């Protein structure tokens, strides 16, 4: 009896264990099935999101573009190449294909290439901004990880590449002027010398047609290589290139500036300049004569003469004239040490800035004596002359007028001295003569305008 009961007990326990195992297996199968079903759902949902993103891009970008769909390693690439008529714009294709070849990583990504059209700032030219957009496809998530501009492609209205050399009537002269202007721009940024020299060399070694550029806000924008801190771009005013630019590309605002530039260039102009003041006895008389004829001039003053004549210096500026630097005590700067010469100039800059609140950044070296080392050590423009009245020598009214009559030409800078009474007395006759010859009177900044650069020497409007 006991053995029979024991056998039945053992058999029951075995059955319970078996049933439990079957239950666990059934639950596991259900869970696994649910997990697989969820993964299938998750994968389908993920694929639907990918297809939805592709459709969204297709709706946005298919018009006017040729779509190409391919794989680069593990990356799925969809490129929208813009069409000109029925042909792909080749310069855009080349830029995209180069990026695919050189920079696209072989990862499980979805990559879009496309362009956006924008105004170029030039007549008959459009920009295509080429963009790369990358989405990571990881763990059933679509995440945008990069949106990069590959650069701008400039195109003519018929879809042909527009390069910087095409903007100019004389590409060789334009490149020479561009190098000069960008060198001055870089110097003002205080870039390390070896870096600045490398940037200039890279531009010089490249054909103008290969320069990376943009045009906006009446400026030619250049992109240097190598890129250095505080110098992502070089912005040069288009007015500095009016002599060599193809004006047909200029829009209304810039075309008006261009026309104004040539109107003024063909207008007869002369700049009267006065050195060695201020002199409280004679300078006010010069100012009164200039005011009578409504003429603005440029005064190069000595630093030592400013003390005690601060109000007179302020009057010169307040009446619309320009005040420049003529050294502290009128030495021959080229015969001084570099430090001594710089001190003569910087001390005068300091006193003028203190009295006037700012500096004109114009300097005239006494006797016209200056060295390259002095010029290159100071962020000033150096103003010489091409007409010497010799008033300092003759001190004779008739002789002063005669000298000017013999030398003056369109764009001349006339040297006189506001410290001599004969000059004061000759000034009305000089003005009357020049007016009768059709001259308009301008200050140095008005005459030289965008030509004015630090460290440079100027003898006239065109020299």
From Swiss-Prot:
Active site: 275, 417
Residues annotated as binding substrate: 367
Binding site for Zn(2+): 276, 326, 330
Cellular component, GO annotation: plasma membrane
Domain of life: Bacteria
Membrane topology annotation: Single-pass membrane protein
Regions crossing the membrane: 18-38
Activity regulation: Enzymatic activity is inhibited by EDTA in vitro.
Entry annotated with the keyword Membrane: yes
Cofactor names: Zn(2+); Co(2+)
Effect the entry attributes to changing residue 391 to N: Loss of activity
Disruption phenotype: Cells lacking this gene produce fully N-acetylated glycan, become hypersensitive to exogenous lysozyme in the stationary phase of growth, and show reduced virulence in the intraperitoneal mouse model.
Residues carrying the site annotation Raises pKa of active site His: 391
Location within or outside the cell: Cell membrane
EC number in record: 3.5.1.104
Catalytic activity, reaction form: peptidoglycan-N-acetyl-D-glucosamine + H2O = peptidoglycan-D-glucosamine + acetate
GO terms of biological process kind: carbohydrate metabolic process; cell wall modification
Keyword annotations: Carbohydrate metabolism, Cell membrane, Cobalt, Hydrolase, Membrane, Metal-binding, Transmembrane, Transmembrane helix, Virulence, Zinc
Cofactor stoichiometry and binding remark: Zn(2+). Although displays higher activity with Co(2+) than with Zn(2+) in vitro, bioavailability may well limit this enzyme to be zinc-dependent.
Alphabetized GO MF terms: lysozyme inhibitor activity; N-acetylglucosamine deacetylase activity; zinc ion binding
Domain NodB homology: 268-442
NCBIfam families: PgAcgDacpgdA_Strep (NF045820)
Function: Catalyzes the deacetylation of N-acetylglucosamine (GlcNAc) residues in peptidoglycan, a modification that confers host lysozyme resistance and contributes to pneumococcal virulence.
PANTHER family (UniProt xref): CHITIN DEACETYLASE 1-RELATED, GLYCOSYL TRANSFERASE-RELATED
Protein name, as recorded: Peptidoglycan-N-acetylglucosamine deacetylase
């Amino acid at each position: 009896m006991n053995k029979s009961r024991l056998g039945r007990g053992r058999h029951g326990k075995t059955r319970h264990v078996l049933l439990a195992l079957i239950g666990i297996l059934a639950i596991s199968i259900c869970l696994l099935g649910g997990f697989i079903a969820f993964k299938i759902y998750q994968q389908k949902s993920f694929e639907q999101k990918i297809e939805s993103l592709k459709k969204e891009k297709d709706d946005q970008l298919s018009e006017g573009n040729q779509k190409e769909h391919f794989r680069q390693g593990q990356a799925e690439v969809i490129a929208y190449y813009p069409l000109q008529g029925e042909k792909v714009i080749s310069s855009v294709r080349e830029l995209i294909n180069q990026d695919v070849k050189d920079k696209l990583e072989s990862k499980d990504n979805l990559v879009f290439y496309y362009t956006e059209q924008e105004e170029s700032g030039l007549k008959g030219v459009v920009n295509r901004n080429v963009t790369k957009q990358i989405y990571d496809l990881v763990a059933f998530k679509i995440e945008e990880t990069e949106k990069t501009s590959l650069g701008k492609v400039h195109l003519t209205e018929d879809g042909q590449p527009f390069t910087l050399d095409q903007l100019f009537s004389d590409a060789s002269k334009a490149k020479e002027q561009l190098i000069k202007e960008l060198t001055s721009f870089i110097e003002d940024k205080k870039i390390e010398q070896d870096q600045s020299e490398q940037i200039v060399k890279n531009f010089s070694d490249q054909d103008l047609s290969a320069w990376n550029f943009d045009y906006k806000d009446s400026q030619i924008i250049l992109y240097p290589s190598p890129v250095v801190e505080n110098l992502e771009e070089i912005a040069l005013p288009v007015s500095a290139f009016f002599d060599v630019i193809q004006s047909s590309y200029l829009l209304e605002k810039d075309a008006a500036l261009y026309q104004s530039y040539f109107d003024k260039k063909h207008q007869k102009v002369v700049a009267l300049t006065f050195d060695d003041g201020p002199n409280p006895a004679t300078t006010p008389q010069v100012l009164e004569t200039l005011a009578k004829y409504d003429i603005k001039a440029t005064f190069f003053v000595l630093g030592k003469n400013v003390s005690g004549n601060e109000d007179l210096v302020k009057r010169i500026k307040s009446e619309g004239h320009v005040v420049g630097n003529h050294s502290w005590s009128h030495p021959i700067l080229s015969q001084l040490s570099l430090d001594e010469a710089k001190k003569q100039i910087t001390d005068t800059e300091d006193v003028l800035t203190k009295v006037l609140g700012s500096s004109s950044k114009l300097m005239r070296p006494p006797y016209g004596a200056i060295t390259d080392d002095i010029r290159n050590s100071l962020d000033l423009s150096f103003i010489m002359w091409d007409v010497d009245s010799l008033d300092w020598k003759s001190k004779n009214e008739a002789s002063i007028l005669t000298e000017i009559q013999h030398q003056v030409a369109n764009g001349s800078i006339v040297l006189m001295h506001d410290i001599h009474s004969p000059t004061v007395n000759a000034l009305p006759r000089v003005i009357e003569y020049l007016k009768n010859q059709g001259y308009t009177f301008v200050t140095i900044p008005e005459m030289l305008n965008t030509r004015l650069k630090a460290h440079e020497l100027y003898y006239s409007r065109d020299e």
